[in-house]
Amino acid sequence: MKHTMFEIVRAQAEDAAALLNYLKIIGGETDNLSFGPEGVLLALEAEQSYLRLQAQSTDNVQYLAKVNGEIIGTASLNRKNNRMCHRVEFGISLKKAWWGCGAASALTEAILSFAKENDFRQLNLEVRSDNFRAIHLYEKYGFRKLCTFPAFFRINGQDIDFDLMNLSLEE
């Protein structure tokens, strides 16, 4: 899926090093994520193995937004197990310099297309209650707030509330 400035592609094992580096960058840009500038603490081989499995999966997917081969954003769906297998967790991130360019919408549309093709019934996500830009994006695609989870994060001694949101694909 190509756009004027960026393309949306499914993550592959060869994206692992660039993806780990990307996660360090975005972790240092905001406090909206579950990690900081340390990124996710995975070895390169573990990330490659994870992406290799995910690239063939119909239960999980990770898309990348790229500009000239550089990762500027990512979005993923991860299916729950057993009694919750009709539900998937949705996550999305974008380098701050690319906020507002349409990449988050393009990633979300790719995710929704994958979800519908694979008969997922519910998408769930967690978002900082004060991240109005992200909340607006989710609401644009039909996500609804279920509740607020007080003190979901604790950063530098400050409690951060999160909203739990859901999109039903059955309606």
Label each PLM-derived region with a short phrase.
Residues 69, 102, 131:
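Conserved G/P- and acidic residue-centered "switch" motifs that form tight phosphate/ATP-binding loops
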Residues 124-127, 139, 144-160:
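Conserved catalytic-core motifs of GNAT/GCN5-like acyltransferases
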Residues 19:
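Hydrophobic pocket/interface hotspot
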